[in-house]
């Protein structure tokens, strides 16, 4: 079994935790801290983790659906930055909705990679 697959699973789990942390940081921006600087900076880190996930999914020869969903996750991350930087309120309001979709997709990718790694280890 490819090490990239195991690393993908670990990185996906880290990404999932990071996506949840993003909600906390956004909450701090609303209810505590005076700015969203930590939320913005951490969001950029998550984009980089998504790029790493994409490379690992390809190098590790993950199932095609996992690779495609990883590309979708990257696209949602880019969309997240666009939504956060628009001046149209109705469009910007989709930013937290997209964040929820990102968390669910990150969970799905973590579960898929866990099952895939477990099945390859058992074989």
Predicted regions and their residues:
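Polytopic transmembrane helical bundles with strong interfacial aromatic enrichment
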Residues: 1-123
């Amino acid at each position: 079994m490819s090490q990239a697959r195991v690393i993908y699973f670990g990185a996906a789990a880290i990404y999932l935790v990071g996506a949840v942390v993003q909600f906390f940081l956004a909450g701090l921006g609303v209810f505590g801290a005076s700015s969203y600087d930590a939320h913005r900076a951490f969001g950029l880190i998550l984009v980089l983790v998504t790029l790493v996930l994409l490379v690992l999914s390809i190098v590790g020869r993950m199932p095609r659906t996992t690779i495609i969903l990883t590309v979708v996750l990257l696209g949602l991350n880019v969309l997240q930055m666009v939504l956060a930087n628009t001046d149209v309120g109705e469009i910007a309001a989709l930013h937290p909705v997209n964040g929820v979709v990102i968390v669910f997709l990150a969970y799905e990718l973590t579960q898929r990679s866990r099952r895939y790694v477990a099945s390859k280890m058992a074989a």
